[in-house]
Amino acid sequence: MGSLHSIFCVCLILLCIFKENSIVGAINSARMVELRETSRRLFYHGYNNYMQFAFPNDELAPLSCEGLGPDYENPNNIGVNDVRGDYLLTLVDVLDTLVVLGDREGFQDAVDKVIHHINFERDTKVQVFEATIRILGGLLSSHIFASEEKYGFQIPLYKGELLTLATELAERLLPAFRTPTGIPFARINLMKGVAYREVTENCAAAASSLVLEFSMLTALTGNNKFKASAENAFFSVWKRRSGIGLLGNSIDVLSGRWIYPVSGVGAGIDSFYEYAFKSYIFLGDPRYLEVWQKSLESLRHYTASLNEYYYQNVYSANGMVMSRWVDSLSAYFPGLLVLAGELELAKKMHLYYFSIYLKFGQLPERYNLYTKSIELNGYPLRPEFAESTYYLYRATKDVFYLHVGELLLSNIENHLWTPCGFAAVENLEKYTLSNRMESFFLSETLKYLFLLFDDDNPIHRSHHDFIFTTEGHLFPVTNQTRLSTSQRIYDGGEVCVAEDYDRSKWPMLYSLIASRDDYDYVSHLVGIDNKAIPSYLIDPSGVCKRPEYSDGFELLYGSALVSPIKSVERVTNNVYISDIIGNKLKFVQKEGSNSLFLYTAGAESINENDTVFLTDPDYETFTRPDALYFDRTIAQLENPNSGQKTFGKFLQFDNDNSLPSKVFKTVLLNNSMCQKPSDTLDKDTAYIAPLGNCSWVQQAKNTNKAGLLILITDGEFINPLENIHSQNSLFNWVKPYIPPTILLKNENNFVSKWANVSVRQSDFDAPSYFQGTPVSNLYLCLKCINS
């Protein structure tokens, strides 16, 4: 097959017709160098202070200027102990960042310190996932750079000590995989192993996102047990997906049952998707590509917002929305979409996170989609948004992403800098800082920002194919990692770049992103105006365009989804729903329209010219007037003498009983029935009266002795939800008899000239409403049900 560059990556020569009105503030080569060096300076401010105040502890406390290690006094403090294993966390995590910065002397010195100071014989219980991605990944990446001459960082007299340490750590982690399912325990004590009666809950991401590191260890040592354990865990999680292809968030490692059956792309599940696609790149195994493709298909259908600016959390069994927020971890997803060639989706999603970033100055841990406010406060120096910005720039070379990176650097330096490091934000609204600088800030956030502004970095050279792990560690993609794969499909590198980008041909002062017609609309979704957007990121002549549909709502009758093949069937432009139970219905509203539109039915997407028919005979059990209901109120009136017909609207008739089949004689009344008539009414007569100023219910009550009431209207609004209990009364629970009542438009007043009339319910398809709002493309097929 062709290379990954041609199959998946959008490695672009931009097909742009630049206009004068596309100008966004320019970043020239000198400014690029300046921003690159700013990234370098910020890194060393954090790194040097860690080495001065915190080494050999795991983390630097940036406010108190001291080192931080495990919380030995409180072993249950998993927020700390999951990552701090008393194993030089920050130093190991940043080793290959020194390579990216071109610091050969610093890299050699750091490797020497790791070799002489690290010790895994520690009585600390760490998270298997964190130890793998931060420590194991850091050791493996650094071993490769230290041992291979071609990368320019080979260390004289280096004897593979980092690989030995990596192997020792992996051996200490392997007992966690000894479960009936092959899914590892979340935590393990480095000295004592898995604790007796250890918690059996693990999240999908932590259980499955170990493939890259363990496969690299197998490639370097030749011992297949590492790769086999990680692969078994990955596919053990995958095979427990729901019937609609969605994973849950947390799982019981002993039984394999989902504990928290909620799906999304954020915390608890994020890196599963990342490692599905990256494992395909790294190993060339088509099984991982299949997992990615099926996952993305289900995510787009069940979790994506209508216009795919963000992905929501839904119940994995039925796709119903569970929460109304997105978290900062999910900001990695645009970058992953870039790698998979879904560039347009990546741009849209990145714009949404960028708008949130502008609103608060950083990405909050959780952002509420509907209140447009912070749901979970804080910013712990996470790298995901910087990572996606980097990938999008490498794929598009659009100056917009350089400006985004410039903003990130500026906010870091101006708001997060402390005399001895950089501090996480505890409260974004008050911008109070917390005394913590997690290792990923140096190993990922500043690494991606440095690479964003360093086009000429050796990492970007075409003959060096690297893949970033979920912790930002660099693994070279070589034949060695794919030797055990029977079918090699992958032939190219992971980082998607426009390799022959010619600055003289494509000046950097142009941006296609700032000129997008949905640029302002995304800001509107988040609730910010142009005043919050830097002027150099605004196209003054840009065109604003609103999407055709706004996000709507979903309905699901029953607790789980049924197979869409059994209950939803398409015949050309008609879609038939034979069973409403188990089919999620998504309704949206067109911009500027007073009606709703059924957008999806089960797994079927509804097109503009489609008509949807419900053929479920039990529909009345699940519909009601104050929610989804079908207006079976078309009345067919007929002159039995001439055969002339016309149609009106039933305001009242008993669905449980057949309409009277007899012929009524007609009587025309000059006055409305808002007042009780003085004469006795006849049950064999149809009374025709003008619609009065009182409610139709009151008029029908006043005509309760009649056989039929026909109200003539000039087009006044009649509330279809008004019913016989609408009048305030102590006796509203008693249902009085009122005759069948029909509303007839004035142009059909010729009925009053008929001597007799018969009436029945029409066989026309019944239109649908949701809480009184019409649904333009959904009908109840009465003929289908009656037959």
UniProtKB/Swiss-Prot annotation:
Keywords assigned by UniProt, alphabetized: Endoplasmic reticulum, Glycoprotein, Signal, Unfolded protein response
Signal peptide range: 1-22
InterPro entries: 6hp_glycosidase-like_sf, EDEM1/2/3, Glyco_hydro_47, Seven-hairpin_glycosidases
GO BP term, pick one: endoplasmic reticulum mannose trimming
Major subcellular site: endoplasmic reticulum
Gene3D superfamilies on file: 1.50.10.10
Compartment(s) of residence: Endoplasmic reticulum lumen
Homology family: Belongs to the glycosyl hydrolase 47 family.
Physiological role: Alpha-mannosidase-like protein involved in endoplasmic reticulum-associated degradation (ERAD). Delivers misfolded glycoproteins to proteasomes. It lacks mannosidase activity.
Glycosylation sites per record: 479, 609, 670, 693, 756
Protein name: ER degradation-enhancing alpha-mannosidase-like protein 1
GO molecular function annotations of the record: calcium ion binding; carbohydrate binding
One Gene Ontology cellular component annotation held by this UniProt entry: endoplasmic reticulum lumen
